[in-house]
């Protein structure tokens, strides 16, 4: 069982209620495996709370937003203001720790800056007009990056993640810097993403992630975790493309 210091107040009460319910179930290998699988899915959904809410709003506005606009507010501004309200609500109702909110702010700022560059470079466009924007970038877009930051911070906390055979920190810093540089530089020079993929594999192929689900700790290669996370981000990006939140060709999985 995780220590209570890793939970918000609400999460602590949920965890205690889950133990009261599930600890009374008959114990054998099948029921233990099913319990771990169920709790794993629920915790993943909890970690994706902000990102799931944002993606849900993007889909709903794709289906139900008036074709000519809502008059008093644009779709992009509605998404931006909704994201702000969701974040405030998560903090007020203790669905999120303050440390996670700080991560979200950082990811939003960095993500918005990246969006400004990418739209200027012509990678994609935001076709609709709105008020809350910087250049051609509506501010709701930064919250899509923030959703990734939220997930990373929350999953590390609620799964009590520990890493074995992690390479020296400086190597991660160098790799991250190279990835960000390539994000901008590949518009002007050779795209080295495949070199970066190879470097990522070389650095982390021995690293394993240990995490607690409910009763037991489990182990997963860190590269598998990277792959699964990237896959779901790719799916979410293509849902955003389908919803016409931005305009570009469907994103290739190598992106």
Tell me the role of every PLM-derived stretch.
Residues 34-51:
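N-terminal membrane topogenic signal
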Residues 52, 56, 101, 105-117, ...:
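Hydrophobic, lipid-facing residues on alpha-helical transmembrane segments of integral membrane proteins
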Residues 67-69, 92-101, 116-128:
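Transmembrane alpha-helix boundary signature
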Residues 86, 149-157, 179-186, 198-217:
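Alpha-helical transmembrane segments in multipass membrane proteins, preferentially the mid-helix core
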Residues 91-102, 156-167, 211-220:
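Membrane-interface helix-boundary motifs at transmembrane edges
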Residues 130-144, 254:
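Short aromatic-rich membrane-water interface segments that cap or initiate transmembrane helices
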Residues 249-255:
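Residue-level detector of conserved catalytic or cofactor/ligand-binding positions
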């Amino acid at each position: 069982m995780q220590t209570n210091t890793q939970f918000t107040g609400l999460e602590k009460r949920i965890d205690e209620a889950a133990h009261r319910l599930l600890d009374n179930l008959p114990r054998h290998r099948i029921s233990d495996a099913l319990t771990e699988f169920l709790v794993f899915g629920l915790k993943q959904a909890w970690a994706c709370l902000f990102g799931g809410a944002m993606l849900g709003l993007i889909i709903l506005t794709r289906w139900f937003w008036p074709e000519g606009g809502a008059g008093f507010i644009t779709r992009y501004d509605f998404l931006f203001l909704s994201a702000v309200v969701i974040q405030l609500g998560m903090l007020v109702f203790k669905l999120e720790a303050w440390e996670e909110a700080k991560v979200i702010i950082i990811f939003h700022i960095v993500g918005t800056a990246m969006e400004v560059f990418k739209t200027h470079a012509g990678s994609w466009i935001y076709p609709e007009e709105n008020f809350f924007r910087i250049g051609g970038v509506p501010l709701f877009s930064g919250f899509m990056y923030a959703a990734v930051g939220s997930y990373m911070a929350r999953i590390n906390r609620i799964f009590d993640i520990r890493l074995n055979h992690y390479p020296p920190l400086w190597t991660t810093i160098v790799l991250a810097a190279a990835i960000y540089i390539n994000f901008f530089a590949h518009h002007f020079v050779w795209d080295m993403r495949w070199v970066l993929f190879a470097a990522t594999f070389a650095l982390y192929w021995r690293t394993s992630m240990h995490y607690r689900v409910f009763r037991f700790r489990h182990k997963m290669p860190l590269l598998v975790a990277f792959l699964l996370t990237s896959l779901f981000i790719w799916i979410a990006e293509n849902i955003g493309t389908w919803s016409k939140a931005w305009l570009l060709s469907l994103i290739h999985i190598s992106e």
